[in-house]
Amino acid sequence: MKYYGFWRSLAACRVRIALALKGVKAEEISVNLMQGEQLKPDYRAVNPLAVLPSLILDDGSTPLFESMAIIEYLDETHPQPPLLPKDPKGRARVRGLAQIVACDGHPLIVPRVRNYLEKELKIDEPSRTKWCQHWLMEALTAVESHLAKEKETGKFCHGDSPTLADVCVATQVFGAKFFNCDTAPVPTVMRVFEQCMKIEAFDKSHPLKQPGAPKELKH
């Protein structure tokens, strides 16, 4: 099994964490988003939208795409440990928390959006950074509201073991740290994040611990 990723890609990081939690070995093929390698014809042949990640199965079948779909595939084919609760309401809550990040918050700060803001709309770097900070924290603030008031919250987003929600929330916090967001307004999120980082699968999947990651982060 192989997957296309990049140290800076938060979506690829979700898949990296899920693979590590499941104990599934997969080779990561780096596609440098900062150099536009995702736009080359050979990668577009794998993923026409030219985004990360993409998962290549050993049977040579059609590549899987979109991090959430890939993670649910992994959860179904490698059920231990489960990333979704057994009960329908629990699964819906976990998916909802995950989608606040993966579907509403993160897509607004990805490289193709930032590049459009810069090249087409001529928005300067400080304003682009402010843009990213806004959308990162809007998602985390919404998650905070759920986690702080709902009884299903435990050591993690849902109960006392990590789920799909924790995978997504942790990567959103990585992004918030990249853009120097003030995370003080989301203490429950940060408590859960710190709990996640005690787990090796999360810790070793940190973007800055991946090959090619710089010693000094730049936006």
Please provide the spans of the model-predicted regions.
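Generic structural signal for helix capping and beta-alpha/helix-loop junctions
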Residues: 13, 36, 193, 213-214
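Short, hydrophobic secondary-structure boundary micro-motifs
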Residues: 81-86, 109-111, 154-159, 203-208
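GST-like fold's C-terminal all-alpha helical module
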Residues: 101-198
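Acidic/histidine-enriched, glycine/proline-rich intrinsically disordered or flexible terminal extensions
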Residues: 208-219
